[in-house]
């Protein structure tokens, strides 16, 4: 059985009250799907902006984005690519 995988970027905005410890725990849970991540501090607005590139099934991407959005002081949105990749599960 093949699994559909998608590439997406999850944009995360962390305000000064953001729970960064919990954010990192959640990202670590999904580490097997994360291709890369980049964080940028925006001092003028007192926020941090993180972009996470992920290659995973759509339900995994949605679950991660949803969990991140429920954290205190954190907003997130997922942007999906149009390309799909079908892979066979590992034995």
Model-derived segments and their meaning:
Residues 28-31, 35, 69, 73:
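Signal for well-folded cores of large energy- and translation-related assemblies
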Residues 4-14:
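Short glycine-/aliphatic-rich beta-strand segments at the starts of folded cytosolic domains
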Residues 35-51:
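Amphipathic, hydrophobic secondary-structure cores in small proteins
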Residues 23-27, 63-70:
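Short amphipathic alpha-helices in soluble, non-transmembrane regions
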Residues 17-33:
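Short amphipathic alpha-helix segments
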Residues 36-38, 72-83:
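Conserved short beta-strand edge segments in small beta-sheet-based binding/regulatory domains
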Residues 16-17, 54-59:
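Helix N-cap motif at beta-to-alpha junctions
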Residues 86-91:
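Conserved small/polar residues in nucleotide/adenosyl-binding loops
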């Amino acid at each position: 059985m093949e699994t559909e995988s998608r590439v997406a970027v999850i944009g995360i905005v962390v305000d000064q009250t953001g729970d960064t410890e919990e954010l990192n725990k959640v990202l670590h849970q999904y580490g097997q799907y994360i291709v890369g991540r980049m964080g940028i501090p925006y001092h003028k607005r007192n926020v941090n902006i993180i972009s996470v590139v992920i290659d995973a099934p759509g339900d995994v991407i949605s679950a991660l984005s949803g969990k991140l959005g429920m954290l205190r002081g954190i907003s997130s949105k997922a942007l999906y690519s149009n390309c799909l990749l079908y892979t066979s599960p590992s034995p």
